[in-house]
């Protein structure tokens, strides 16, 4: 587990518990996704440690929220950002968002599967893949499909700590390892 994951965990857990208590989980998912996008921007990343930048950023971010979702920061959202800012932890917002979603999926008994594919999958292929994984895990599956041309062909699927690598690259790597082992 990375240091960022370790640092983000208590924030994600606290926010999730508060969101469940106030029945605002969906709002928090949206808020954290938007905040993650902003904080992940390269131009923003460079200035996260600057107090004056953060003051302006928070004002600008709130204006964006008013325009995009029709409402300003809630008191809880503002407190969350202020705590992260005061502790110099704004850069971990994307990891907090990831862990928040994991907590949500776990509470809903949903499995998140990340599918890496060499070529884009059409909707029919996604639904078939989702149904196959659901049969294996015996629960609902949410797919996160990402194109990764380096796989050459096929797919690599990650869920519940498991990796199923059916990519051409993975097969070539396994074949190369077998050759190396046979030489020794």
Curated annotation (Swiss-Prot):
One GO cellular component this record assigns the protein to is:
plasma membrane
Localization (cell): Cell inner membrane
Q: Quick check: keyword Cell inner membrane in the entry?
A: yes
Q: Name the major location.
A: membrane
The record's GO molecular-function terms, alphabetically, read: proton-transporting ATP synthase activity, rotational mechanism
Q: Which InterPro entries match?
A: ATP_synth_OSCP/delta_N_sf, ATPase_OSCP/dsu
Topology in the lipid bilayer? Peripheral membrane protein
Question: Which key words are in the record?
Answer: ATP synthesis, Cell inner membrane, Cell membrane, CF(1), Hydrogen ion transport, Ion transport, Membrane, Transport
Q: Offer one Pfam family short name for this entry.
A: OSCP
**Oligomeric form and interacting partners:** F-type ATPases have 2 components, F(1) - the catalytic core - and F(0) - the membrane proton channel. F(1) has five subunits: alpha(3), beta(3), gamma(1), delta(1), epsilon(1). F(0) has three main subunits: a(1), b(2) and c(10-14). The alpha and beta chains form an alternating ring which encloses part of the gamma chain. F(1) is attached to F(0) by a central stalk formed by the gamma and epsilon chains, while a peripheral stalk is formed by the delta and b chains.
**What role does it play?**
F(1)F(0) ATP synthase produces ATP from ADP in the presence of a proton or sodium gradient. F-type ATPases consist of two structural domains, F(1) containing the extramembraneous catalytic core and F(0) containing the membrane proton channel, linked together by a central stalk and a peripheral stalk. During catalysis, ATP synthesis in the catalytic domain of F(1) is coupled via a rotary mechanism of the central stalk subunits to proton translocation. This protein is part of the stalk that links CF(0) to CF(1). It either transmits conformational changes from CF(0) to CF(1) or is implicated in proton conduction.
Listed PANTHER family: ATP SYNTHASE DELTA CHAIN
Can you tell me which family this protein belongs to? Belongs to the ATPase delta chain family.
Q: What is this protein called?
A: ATP synthase subunit delta
Gene transcribed to yield this protein? atpH
